[in-house]
Amino acid sequence: MSLSNWPLKKENSEAYNIKNSKQITIPDGLWIKCFDCGLLMYSKVLKRNLKVCPQCSYHFQASSNERIDQLIDQGSWQPMDVHLISTDPLGFKDQKLYSQRLKDTAFKTGLQDAVQTGTGTMQGKKVCLGIMDFRFMGGSMGSVVGEKLTRLLEKATQEKLPAIILCASGGARMQEGMLSLMQMAKISSALEMHKKENLLYISVLTSPTTGGVTASFAMLGDLIIAEPKALIAFAGRRVIEQTIKEDLPDNFQSSEYLFEHGFLDLIVSRTQLRSKLIQILSLHNHSK
């Protein structure tokens, strides 16, 4: 007798019927796949490792809130200028009104703009800290970002505190035109006043750090630190290749390439960043 004619009990046939089997629903975000090595891991494992792949050390993007938790002593964070909100001086519109885009992004991220600033302690040492957030319009630098960072640096100068800025940005915000470009000079001027008081400024470059941010305060640190394999650039790779009519190296605009050519002082993994910053702050205080 052929298998097709083999008698099956009704209850057995129903037990092996896929349609009748109980389906298991897996919650969204439970698993995360590494973009670099392809490792599939629990999201909790990635979070516990500060969003660094435990297999290949690929650095996932981290939010400004996550950065604060990773770097600052618990309970010591004092935010600054949380009330500042961008306006729409040009009445700019692309696919939607800039004013509406600001509202939508604020609702989605819970942020007022692309940077959080404030003071806190790192192993008891008080610092002024600015953390850019790429989730808010690509971390673009508009008038509010520039004003908040300038006020942060002025406070650091007034209170004789070291300043640390973590950069993550696509550059100047085109929706604000010249108002965004002038922030480059404004922040740089505040840094010069901070420097004249012989105070420490540490710039930490994360992926990506590009455009007007790279062309100003990101590269003005007394110490310039970058995360591994971070994209750090001014113009885009294709723009440069089309301009100079040459092919660029594969690792061009990576933190490793910049370190090799003397643009960076250190490349530090996110898992070691807090301890390295504390070490630098201790050495700076000891040298006074």
UniProtKB/Swiss-Prot annotation:
GO biological process: fatty acid biosynthetic process; malonyl-CoA biosynthetic process
Major localisation: plastid
Reaction equation(s) it catalyzes: N(6)-carboxybiotinyl-L-lysyl-[protein] + acetyl-CoA = N(6)-biotinyl-L-lysyl-[protein] + malonyl-CoA
Cofactors required: Zn(2+)
GO cellular component: acetyl-CoA carboxylase complex; chloroplast stroma
Transmembrane segments: none
Pathway(s): Lipid metabolism; malonyl-CoA biosynthesis; malonyl-CoA from acetyl-CoA: step 1/1
Pfam families tied to this protein: Carboxyl_trans, Zn_ribbon_ACC
Top-level EC class: transferase
EC number per UniProt: 2.1.3.15
Residues binding Zn(2+), per UniProt: 34, 37, 53, 56
Subcellular localization: Plastid, Chloroplast stroma
Keyword set includes Transferase: yes
Domain CoA carboxyltransferase N-terminal: 30-288
Biological function: Component of the acetyl coenzyme A carboxylase (ACC) complex. Biotin carboxylase (BC) catalyzes the carboxylation of biotin on its carrier protein (BCCP) and then the CO(2) group is transferred by the transcarboxylase to acetyl-CoA to form malonyl-CoA.
Family annotation (NCBIfam families): accD
Homology family: Belongs to the AccD/PCCB family.
UniProt name for this protein: Acetyl-coenzyme A carboxylase carboxyl transferase subunit beta, chloroplastic
Origin organism lineage: Eukaryota, Rhodophyta, Bangiophyceae, Bangiales, Bangiaceae
Designated gene of the protein: accD
